[in-house]
């Protein structure tokens, strides 16, 4: 996907909007599935979704996942500048080694992460925590600082430094994977 450069102050604002929504939903135990699209096109997952071309805002993200909203059970897809689709159905991971700890949102996040390069953030309504799925791995209970750093790197990514961004993300994910899992 071609993307023009996003000024750093705008990347910081977008990061704050998404982090604010995730933190609100975490605190209020509102389940959510937010997909940060990268290079892999996700058009196949828009078929049953509501197509959007909306500015990324904390309030709109929260309202999409509000329990009485008909879109709340599906995923929200963002690119680096806009919210592009809501109510998306994602492929579920079907690996038998996946713990029963994971619910449908976590399985959907893992499933999409196995077939795309997307970063998928999951808010657990049962535990009130945010997890990240990337390349078939799930990092549970992200700390606020980790989530904010990840979002800022995502929104501020530049084509000319994409390789560096991916190396940093890979290193960050290795740290998450190496930390002991907490039930």
Predicted regions and their residues:
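Divalent-cation
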Residues: 1-183
